[in-house]
Amino acid sequence: LLLNRPEKLNAFTFLMMEELISAFDAIEADDNLKAVIISGAGRAFCAGADLSSGKDTFNPSFDNFAVKQDDFRRDSGGILTLRMYKFLKPIIFACNGPAVGIGASMQLPGDIRIASEDARFGFVFNNRGIVPDACSSWFLPKIVGISKALDLTFSGRIIESKEALDISLISSIHKPENLIDDAIKIAQELIEKSAPISIAITRQMLWRSFGQSDPYDAHVIESKAIDSRGASDDAKEGVNSFLEKRPAKFKNLISSDMPDFFPWWDDNA
């Protein structure tokens, strides 16, 4: 997926949110697509929210596209990242340039985040008189730790790829001309030897473990998943292929063969 408003440094709009969510829906429904890579067109990944409305950019009374729920207007960045959170396939962000505001926070639900040498990251919300968006107050501390998350959000300072790597915001730095090819290689490593349904369940198990209060909660889900997967054709193929020293050919499909207990969480998004 390519954020494709290079003339605006891929500034984020409600339409971009809708198109990204539609793309995630389509990719998830297509069993031939095993992972998604997201990058930006041109020299930026995403320069943040489109500020063409000037001082009224963040004023809810000027938001003609608001999605409202109960007594609040839902943040469009959060609607997007919650869709990513529920996604059933690996998400890789290949950050090709500056990523500011929502450009930085939208990457946090990614399973792997890599960046070019030209990338920069800035959680600049407090500098604009607002607060972190896109569920980043939940994601960011879990990725970089609470003290570093507060440092980045209080100050709004822009960090380069090297510091992003040092604090585990990204996992690797790449030459700009190699970024997408390297992201594809990483995606292939993630998916080529593993069963798609096992990846889907594992992704949700690990991300949702942050909301569990006791390891017993994880034990319950793992037990159900092991029983379900252990009786599947994929498990038989996994064992047989190992014993026969050949690559596995997993046939169970996300579109039709997810276990009965899935999803196990209350969906309030």
Task: Write out the residue ranges for each language-model feature.
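Glycine- (often His-adjacent) and acidic-residue-rich active-site loop
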Residues: 32, 40-83, 99, 129, ...
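C-terminal long alpha-helix characteristic of the crotonase
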Residues: 6, 114-119, 170-221, 227-237, ...
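Hydrophobic alpha-helical membrane-association signature
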Residues: 16-19, 76, 222
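Crotonase-fold acyl-CoA enzyme core
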Residues: 82-197, 232, 246
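Terminal peptide-recognition signature
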Residues: 1, 5, 19-20, 38, ...
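Conserved CoA-thioester-binding segment of acyl-CoA-metabolizing enzymes
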Residues: 1-41, 57, 260-269
